[in-house]
């Protein structure tokens, strides 16, 4: 048997952790038979090396402002080409709504690599849908990870025929999850008091109001421990939590492993949350985030209509409070948990891993003139879109020294990623030649 093939996963930084979580779940399933590498624009990539032993690199998104928009696709191209050359990768998998032109250019530069788009369904009908035919045609394969709410998908991807559909993908796997006692010990929770996990975003005014409304619905639950993954505060540091709650902010990755610690959950209706919490049979209230391309309301309606979760009206703060309050009823919690036991196991990670292994063994394809033309079209469409939309990004950094690191420590990586400096990460164990190339890339796009 030959050496295990390298498969690169590249993910965008969406709302939530769905893209990175899917890539990680598939990479875990691949690990016995392949060498997965994850490059991600999500800051949570800092957690992956120490949690799973998977090689990872942070890839700054265009919104960081570390180089101009016109150069960013070329920077992505050169980063991915260098990684392909270092690892002799056979497949490049992109998980995100928009397959950026830089990834397509990298495959065009290294045509021996097969390009796969991991394209989640349930798109909202927004302007991005018009690029779907062009984007899909630039791929060697399109794989659609299954969604419990697939029957309610009436978006633009639901009409397309090129995708290979699989079972849902999730970091939650029953065989790997800790039991209730172990989970509570790992999180430092009281073994005898009820606990609720609240995973809602904050930042924008409407998101802050939803957080407060949800927390208000937990008031009156005797001896309750309210568990959050970040402090419930607004941009000015003001608490969003009403008085009378025992709040505990935890840091644990992956949370999918310790969901048995909780009696109920309140979360956004993203792909990741639904396919972890419901797969774990956790009684859940869903509060949709309507930003972005993910049709969270369609997913929430399906879960509610068939009795798998409670859907709060995200536009009605009083309804959010009252719906969350229903979780205080033990009969309601028992009913939701019992119903979730009917859901199929999220085994899509293993399915996709097996498909990628077969793709890795396929002979290289020739990159056609039409594919190269599609790359140019997508690149200039993206630049024009950003100029028209004037999407907010951080102010460009022109004179800050670049920080290089090969650390796999989650705290160190997280600090560097969140800092105001340009941060270039090498995966641990990379060669001196690769590091020299990466320095050259940084000099080219950031300046010396």
Cite the ranges covered by each PLM segment.
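Acidic donor-binding loop of glycosyltransferase active sites
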Residues: 260-273, 282
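Conserved nucleotide-sugar phosphate-binding/catalytic loop shared by glycosyltransferases and other
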Residues: 3-15, 29-79
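C-terminal amphipathic helix plus adjacent low-complexity
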Residues: 328-404, 410, 420-422, 426, ...
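A nucleotide-sugar donor-handling region in carbohydrate enzymes
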Residues: 120, 124-127, 135-202
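A short, glycine/small-residue-rich beta-strand->loop->alpha-helix junction that serves as a flexible
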Residues: 10-22, 205-207
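Catalytic binding pocket for nucleotide-activated donors in carbohydrate/polymer assembly enzymes
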Residues: 273-321
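Donor-nucleotide binding loops and adjacent catalytic segments primarily
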Residues: 181-264
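Short N-terminal targeting/anchoring amphipathic segment
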Residues: 81-99
């Amino acid at each position: 048997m030959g050496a295990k093939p390298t498969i690169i996963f590249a993910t965008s930084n969406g709302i939530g952790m769905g893209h990175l979580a899917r890539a990680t779940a598939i990479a875990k399933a691949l690990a016995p038979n392949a060498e997965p590498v994850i490059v991600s624009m999500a800051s949570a990539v800092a957690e992956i090396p120490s949690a799973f032993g998977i090689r990872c690199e942070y890839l700054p998104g265009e919104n960081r402002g570390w180089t101009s928009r016109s150069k960013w696709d070329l920077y992505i191209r050169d980063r991915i080409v260098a990684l392909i050359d270092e690892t002799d990768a056979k497949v490049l998998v992109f998980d995100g709504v928009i397959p950026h032109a830089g990834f397509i250019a990298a495959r065009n530069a290294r045509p021996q690599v097969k390009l796969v788009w991991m394209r989640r369904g349930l798109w909202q009908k927004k302007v991005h849908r018009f690029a779907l035919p062009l984007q899909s045609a630039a791929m060697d394969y399109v794989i659609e990870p299954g969604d419990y709410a697939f029957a309610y998908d009436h978006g633009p991807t639901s009409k397309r025929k090129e995708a290979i559909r699989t079972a849902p993908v999730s970091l939650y796997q029953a065989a790997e999850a800790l039991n209730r006692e172990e989970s509570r010990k790992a999180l430092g929770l009281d073994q005898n008091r009820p606990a609720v996990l609240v995973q809602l975003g904050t930042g924008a005014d409407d998101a802050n109001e939803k957080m407060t409304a949800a927390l208000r619905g937990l008031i009156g639950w005797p001896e309750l421990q309210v568990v959050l993954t970040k402090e419930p505060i607004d941009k000015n540091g003001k608490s969003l939590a009403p008085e009378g709650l025992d709040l505990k902010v935890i840091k644990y990755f992956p949370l999918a492993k310790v969901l048995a610690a909780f009696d109920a959950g309140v979360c956004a209706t993203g792909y990741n949350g639904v396919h972890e919490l419901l797969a774990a049979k956790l009684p859940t209230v869903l509060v949709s985030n309507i930003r972005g391309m993910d049709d969270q309301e369609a997913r929430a309606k399906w879960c509610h209509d068939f009795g798998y979760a409670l859907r709060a009206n995200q536009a009605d703060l009083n309804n959010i409070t009252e719906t969350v309050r229903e979780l205080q009823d033990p009969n309601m919690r028992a009913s939701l948990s019992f119903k979730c036991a009917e859901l199929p196991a999220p085994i899509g990670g293993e399915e996709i891993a097996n498909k990628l292994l077969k793709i890795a063994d396929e002979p290289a394809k020739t990159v056609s003139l039409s594919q190269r033309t599609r790359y140019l079209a997508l690149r200039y469409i993206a630049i024009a879109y950003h100029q028209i939309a004037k999407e907010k990004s951080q102010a460009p950094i022109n004179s800050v020294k670049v920080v290089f690191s090969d650390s796999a420590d989650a705290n160190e990586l997280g600090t560097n990623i969140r800092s105001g400096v340009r941060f270039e990460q090498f995966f641990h164990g990379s060669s001196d030649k690769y590091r020299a190339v990466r320095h050259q890339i940084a000099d080219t796009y950031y300046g010396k």
